[in-house]
């Protein structure tokens, strides 16, 4: 599923997703609260059918009212109900002994990857409490007025570049991807994190509009908001890590296949694939969703496919619309112009958007000092884990925040994704001080070039070695 985590290990799993929200180990039925949710329906629906503890914490930083509201919807489920609602028939006998007893969250989640530390009611951590206090003191968490004006100008630029592209102008192949990145990708990323505005409808409209030519909203929510932001750099859980494997090995815990290929070939093949990431976001991810739906109908879907299909199905119509717009982008030039010009108008924007995404977005996480054994990372409070699995650079530069849509400060962004990237440069000095106070060593680079260089070094080492022990020996 777009993008699925590994689901071929462990015991048999439920094939029918449940409809509950699992937070801090407790089960909640928030169905009746969806329409009343202040953050909008899309935000709350991301957590349905899964353990959404990290999501719940990440988007509720301004006060603690959410904890009181949440308790109104706590439910106690008998294990028998969990079995009939959630598990395959061949699993019912495994929990029948508990019939009549309260089902724990692990049984309800079922398909969720095993959590390392036990979930407890509201995990408080001094580091995260200081982060929340910092955000509250800052005040405005949504897009700043200068960036709103800038993006209005970008709309004009996007329309102009699309007009040139429609006319077949050579220059449009360079200008269009620029506006797709600084405007559309920014709208999808910030809007998808509900960070543009306090009004859910504004976030929704901007996200879905920007996604028409950049990615599929439903698949993006699944891979990015849920799998990546909740499980950053955890192998088998982080959708970004697993979406590249086995074609690209980007973590020491991942296997290296095929073993008979020279490491230099693996390394350069990896870089070549960077040019096609945009196709994965716009076409392959949605198609994998439809494969999951088809597998469900045939009864062959495993639990992970079923869970992910349920999440993306909430945005089925937008997935269809986005496939139509992307299809039109790739087909129209070949109907209007000669083959070479059509190839230029389609492939060059694809390459530029792909490189922008892979270099700017992935360079922060695929770094040796940002990767550690998943079992060790899972022992940390999730906020500390976010700070230790991202590399930052040019953090106090508004220009670089603009050019990278805030992805130059991913450690802070991952802790408070609901804060607009336009606010991050002003927050970063206080964030750095908080990290120093709590003994968290930030992973910093001088600039993007420096970060990209250490990223390449990481890929080179990973192309030759297998384990953390071997990697450490190489770097010693």
UniProtKB/Swiss-Prot annotation:
One of its GO terms (molecular function) is heme binding. Residues 10-75 form the Cytochrome b5 heme-binding domain. A motif (Histidine box-2) lies at residues 224-229. Keywords: Fatty acid biosynthesis, Fatty acid metabolism, Heme, Iron, Lipid biosynthesis, Lipid metabolism, Membrane, Metal-binding, Oxidoreductase, Transmembrane, Transmembrane helix. Pfam families: Cyt-b5, FA_desaturase. Its EC number is 1.14.19.12. It is a multi-pass membrane protein. One of its GO terms (cellular component) is membrane. A motif (Histidine box-3) lies at residues 410-414. It catalyses: a (9Z,12Z)-octadecadienoyl-containing glycerolipid + 2 Fe(II)-[cytochrome b5] + O2 + 2 H(+) = a (5Z,9Z,12Z)-octadecatrienoyl-containing glycerolipid + 2 Fe(III)-[cytochrome b5] + 2 H2O; (9Z,12Z,15Z)-octadecatrienoyl-containing glycerolipid + 2 Fe(II)-[cytochrome b5] + O2 + 2 H(+) = a (5Z,9Z,12Z,15Z)-octadecatetraenoyl-containing glycerolipid + 2 Fe(III)-[cytochrome b5] + 2 H2O. Gene3D superfamilies: Cytochrome b5-like heme/steroid binding domain. It is an enzyme of class 1 (oxidoreductase). It comes from the Eukaryota. Pathway: Lipid metabolism; polyunsaturated fatty acid biosynthesis. A motif (Histidine box-1) lies at residues 189-193. It is found in: Membrane. Heme binds at residues 37, 60. PROSITE patterns: CYTOCHROME_B5_1, CYTOCHROME_B5_2. InterPro entries: Cyt_B5-like_heme/steroid-bd (IPR001199), Cyt_B5-like_heme/steroid_sf (IPR036400), Cyt_B5_heme-BS (IPR018506), FA_desaturase_dom (IPR005804), Fatty_acid_desaturase (IPR012171). Belongs to the fatty acid desaturase type 1 family. PANTHER family: CYTOCHROME B5 HEME-BINDING DOMAIN-CONTAINING PROTEIN, FATTY ACID DESATURASE 2. Front-end desaturase having a omega-13 desaturase activity for omega-9 unsaturated C18/C20 fatty acids. Strong substrate preferences for linoleic acid and alpha-linolenic acid for the production of pinolenic and coniferonic acids respectively. No desaturase activity for dihomo gamma-linolenic acid and eicosatertraenoic acid. The histidine box domains may contain the active site and/or be involved in metal ion binding. This is Acyl-lipid omega-13 desaturase. It comes from Chlamydomonas reinhardtii.
């Amino acid at each position: 599923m777009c993008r699925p985590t590994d689901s071929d290990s462990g015991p048999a799993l439920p094939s029918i997703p449940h409809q509950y929200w699992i937070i801090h180990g407790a089960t909640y039925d928030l169905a009746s609260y969806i329409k009343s949710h202040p953050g909008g329906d899309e935000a709350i629906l991301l957590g349905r059918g899964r353990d959404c503890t990290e999501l719940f914490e990440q988007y509720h930083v301004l006060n603690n009212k959410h904890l009181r509201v949440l308790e109104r919807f706590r439910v106690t489920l008998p294990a028998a109900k969990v079995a009939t609602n959630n598990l395959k028939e061949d699993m019912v006998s495994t929990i029948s002994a508990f019939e009549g007893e309260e089902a724990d969250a692990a049984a309800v989640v079922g398909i969720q990857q095993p959590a390392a530390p036990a979930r407890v009611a509201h995990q408080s951590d001094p580091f995260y409490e200081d982060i929340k206090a910092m955000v509250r003191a800052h005040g405005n968490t949504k897009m700043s007025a200068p960036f709103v004006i800038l993006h209005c100008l970008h709309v004009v630029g996007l329309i102009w570049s699309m007009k040139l592209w429609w006319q077949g102008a050579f220059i449009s192949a360079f200008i269009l991807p620029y506006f797709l990145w600084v405007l559309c990708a920014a709208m999808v990323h910030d809007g998808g994190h509900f960070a543009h505005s306090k009004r859910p409808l504004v976030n929704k409209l901007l996200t879905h509009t920007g996604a028409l030519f950049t990615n599929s909203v439903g698949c993006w929510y699944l891979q990015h908001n849920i799998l990546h932001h909740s499980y950053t750099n955890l192998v088998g859980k982080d959708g970004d890590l697993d979406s590249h494997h086995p074609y690209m090995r980007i973590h020491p815990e991942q296997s290296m296949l095929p073993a008979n290929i020279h490491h230099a070939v693996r390394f350069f093949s990896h870089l070549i694939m960077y040019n096609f990431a945009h196709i994965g976001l716009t076409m392959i991810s949605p198609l994998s969703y439809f494969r999951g739906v088809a597998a469900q109908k045939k009864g062959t879907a495993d639990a992970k496919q079923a869970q992910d299909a349920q999440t993306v199905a909430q945005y089925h119509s937008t997935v269809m619309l986005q496939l139509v717009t992307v299809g039109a982008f790739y087909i129209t030039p070949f109907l209007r112009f000669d083959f070479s010009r059509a190839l230029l108008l389609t492939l060059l924007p694809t390459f530029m958007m792909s490189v922008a995404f892979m270099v700017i977005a992935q360079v922060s996480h695929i770094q040796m000092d940002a990767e550690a054994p998943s079992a060790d990372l899972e022992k940390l409070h999730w906020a500390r884990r976010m700070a230790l699995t991202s590399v930052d650079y040019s953090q106090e530069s508004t220009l670089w925040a603009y050019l990278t849509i805030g992805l130059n400060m991913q450690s802070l962004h991952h802790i408070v994704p609901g804060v607009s990237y336009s606010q991050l440069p002003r927050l970063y000095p206080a964030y750095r001080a908080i990290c120093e106070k709590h003994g968290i060593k930030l992973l910093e680079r001088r600039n993007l070039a420096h970060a990209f260089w250490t990223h390449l070094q990481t890929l080179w080492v990973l192309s030759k070695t297998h384990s953390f022990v071997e990697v450490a020996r190489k770097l010693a």
